[in-house]
């Protein structure tokens, strides 16, 4: 009797370990980084859009490895348009992911370098950081680079001199973090 019980218990433990392994594989497979073709509806009235994630009240709240969605809200009564950004879990479909933050080298108190210079500098820094984050050369990647540079008003009051760089796939959403994805 003891032997039959031991064999039965052994079989049960073996079966449970197989189930646990297959559920781990399934969970890992669900979060494989990728690009989801097509864009979810991100424009609509305040009442019709379903927002996901934490609402960002100030774009400078976004930081490295934050994944985010962008929405365009239209007020049905006035026709006013406003843009809204939310931080979401990177395992959920998202529009973009912040991969780097770079402080402009100008000394405190120096005037704003201008939009053209700021965009040029941001493009260089974002390009330089792309391969280290994604794991592939930009020219071979399906991802594009975007940046959120400081605005003149924020620069002049000394609040922000940091540019945030992000990756996105035009016309699509991302799934999982793009860190080391090679996409």
Map each language-model feature to its residues.
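Bacterial N-terminal signal peptides that target proteins for export
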Residues: 1-9
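Primary mode marks residue(s) on the alpha4-beta5-alpha5 output face of response regulator receiver
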Residues: 22-183
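C-terminal motif of bacterial Sec signal peptides marking the signal peptidase cleavage site
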Residues: 17-20
